[in-house]
Curated annotation (Swiss-Prot):
<comment type="function">
    <text>Probably involved in the biogenesis of the ribosome.</text>
</comment>
<keyword id="KW-0690">Ribosome biogenesis</keyword>
<protein>
    <recommendedName>
        <fullName>Probable Brix domain-containing ribosomal biogenesis protein</fullName>
    </recommendedName>
</protein>
<feature type="domain" description="Brix">
    <location>
        <begin position="1"/>
        <end position="196"/>
    </location>
</feature>
<dbReference type="InterPro" id="IPR007109">
    <property type="entry name" value="Brix"/>
</dbReference>
<dbReference type="InterPro" id="IPR023548">
    <property type="entry name" value="Brix_dom_Rbsml_bgen_prot"/>
</dbReference>
<dbReference type="GO" id="GO:0019843">
    <property type="term" value="F:rRNA binding"/>
</dbReference>
<dbReference type="GO" id="GO:0006364">
    <property type="term" value="P:rRNA processing"/>
</dbReference>
Length: 208
């Protein structure tokens, strides 16, 4: 699915976030960046058969931005970006030592029930960014969606007061609650011009 790495000299928390993402994106890998350039990373992702490269950028010790890049030697390019309020790691939610998914299965993206059109739009965008599959929620349970799509993992777009949240379910671990990580998104931007900003959505005017 994707190769996951960070900007140069990441903090421990950012590395932990990368490892957590490796455990919820099927058949993906977290790789220590070292001195590798973006071109080096793209070649490594291509050699390993991945369709996406995800780079986690750091600010003041915490993950600030997630950059998604399409892996294709003839048509590689930036797809889009998520700007974050913050994250909660799996261990902070109560889960440790979750194994990665080392087999091919769909990464399904849906929404919580009773959310707005902005959440549905972001669910579709998140599926594009990750190479996943968007499935409308309707009245279906998450377990029903997982069963119909032959997967153990679902990313769910949820309400959050200052933006939107992405949470992750691993049904091979527990069917009762999400395992994380929890990603709190304040802005998303796609290279084709689509974008969303929580301040604009809430009508908050910038300070002059």
């Amino acid at each position: 699915m994707m190769l996951i790495t960070t900007s140069h000299r990441p903090t421990r928390r950012t590395r932990s976030f990368g490892h957590d993402l490796e455990k919820v994106f099927p058949n993906s890998l977290y790789l220590t960046r070292g001195k590798k350039t973006i071109q080096d990373l793209l070649m490594e992702a291509y050699d390993r058969g991945y369709e996406r490269l995800l780079i986690i950028n750091v600010w003041k010790g915490n993950p600030l931005k997630m950059t998604f890049i399409k892996v294709d030697p003839e048509d590689w390019g930036y797809i889009g970006y998520l700007y974050l309020h913050g994250i909660k790691l799996q261990r902070e939610i109560g889960f440790r030592n979750i194994p990665p998914i080392r087999e091919e299965m769909p990464f399904v993206v849906t929404t919580a029930k009773r959310v707005g059109i902005d959440h549905t739009a972001f669910a579709q965008v998140f599926a594009e960014l990750t190479g996943g599959k968007f499935v409308p929620r309707g009245n279906k349970s998450l377990q029903t969606i997982a069963d119909k799509n032959n997967t153990d993992v679902i990313g769910v777009i949820e309400n959050y007061p200052r933006g939107m949240a992405v949470n992750f379910y691993r049904f091979d671990i527990t069917r009762e609650r999400p395992v994380g990580p929890l990603i709190l998104v304040k802005i998303w931007i796609m290279e084709d011009g689509r974008r969303w900003d929580y301040k604009e959505a809430l009508g908050i005017k910038p300070k002059e």
